[in-house]
């Protein structure tokens, strides 16, 4: 099976404050509630199509990659920090409203983009009618029962990203790496090829392919998690937030228990998807879409 993404109804670029650009793609129903949707560190929004395809019949879906990811040309210098990602998200929300008009809007964000959306909403301002956060890998404060586990997890990811292979002769090489990865074993059929197509670009020197998000940038984001101080209560936001985690009972899960703890301690509307890991939207896309729409309906948005 191979996923074929639909042609967007509209594409446009958003210029960021340092000259970098983000490519926006508009899918779904133009008359529907607006959804802004993005991805996790080192991934790309197109690769989440197994999930967001289920939202297209009802919603106006704007899909985008954060800087140095996906369809965007890598920035030089990269300015690949959470502080910059927060500024970028503010620019995205402003420009989308300026170009397409104001209407009910929800944000749907996974992992890195989820943390960015949380930080943006608390430190910059609430720009949404609702937020849906998939498994943001937040660090609890020092002394918390799961702090050491999460700290070790982020350090392992940082080391892994620094050593990650950057270049590939073909897209299929990376797709096969994903198929052989234990972490990607539960992805739906076709997702491994889609992910490889989404995170690679042709090498500027014409020799094969390379990761759009280079390993140094990916490692930087993992390392910055240690100092974000992001463990907010749901009441810290200016509107309704849904927290959806991976299965906290899965063997070896770290982000699952972390989100379960955040949900309980922070008073969130929290759910988890059984038998999933961190890429839950690609492992059980229909279940994730169902939870999304049910929450949006409770908010009067579906």
Where are these regions (language model features)?
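N-terminal cap/lid segment of alpha/beta-hydrolase-fold proteins
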Residues: 2-21
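Active-site loop/oxyanion-hole signature of alpha/beta-hydrolase fold enzymes
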Residues: 17, 66-108, 290
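Conserved HGGG/HGGXW glycine-rich cap/lid loop of the alpha/beta-hydrolase fold
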Residues: 23-74
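Conserved hydrolase catalytic core segment
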Residues: 103-146
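A catalytic-pocket lid/entrance helix-loop region that shapes and gates access to the active site
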Residues: 134-168
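Conserved alpha/beta-hydrolase catalytic His-Asp/Glu region
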Residues: 163-223
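Conserved serine/cysteine hydrolase catalytic core
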Residues: 201-263
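Catalytic histidine-centered segment of alpha/beta-hydrolase-like enzymes
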Residues: 276-285
């Amino acid at each position: 099976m191979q996923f074929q993404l639909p042609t967007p109804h509209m594409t446009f670029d958003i210029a960021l404050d340092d000259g970098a650009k983000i490519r926006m793609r508009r899918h779904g129903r133009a008359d529907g509630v607006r959804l802004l949707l993005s991805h996790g560190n080192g991934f790309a929004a197109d690769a989440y199509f197994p999930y967001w395809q289920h939202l297209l019949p009802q919603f106006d879906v704007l899909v985008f990659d954060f800087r140095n990811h996906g369809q965007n040309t890598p920035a030089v210098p990269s300015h690949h920090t959470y502080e910059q990602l927060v500024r970028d998200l503010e620019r995205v929300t402003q420009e989308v409203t300026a170009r397409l008009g104001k209407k009910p809007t929800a944000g749907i964000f996974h992992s890195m983009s989820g943390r960015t959306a949380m930080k943006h909403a608390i430190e910059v301002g609430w720009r949404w009618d609702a937020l849906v956060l998939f498994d943001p890998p937040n660090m609890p404060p020092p002394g918390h029962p799961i702090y050491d586990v999460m700290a070790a997890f982020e350090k392992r990811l940082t080391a892994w990203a620094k050593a990650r292979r950057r270049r590939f002769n073909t897209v299929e090489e990376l797709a096969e790496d994903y198929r052989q990865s234990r972490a990607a074993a539960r992805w739906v059929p076709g997702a491994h090829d889609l992910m490889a197509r989404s995170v690679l670009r042709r090498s500027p020197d014409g020799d094969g392919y390379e990761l759009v998000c280079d390993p140094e940038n990916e490692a930087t984001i993992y390392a910055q998690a240690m100092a974000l101080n992001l463990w907010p209560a749901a009441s810290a936001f200016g509107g309704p937030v849904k927290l959806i985690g991976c299965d906290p009972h899965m063997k070896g899960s770290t982000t699952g228990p972390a989100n379960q703890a955040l949900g309980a301690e922070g008073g969130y509307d929290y759910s988890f998807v059984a038998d999933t890991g961190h890429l839950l939207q690609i492992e059980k896309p229909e279940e994730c879409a169902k939870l999304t729409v049910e929450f949006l309906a409770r908010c009067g948005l579906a």
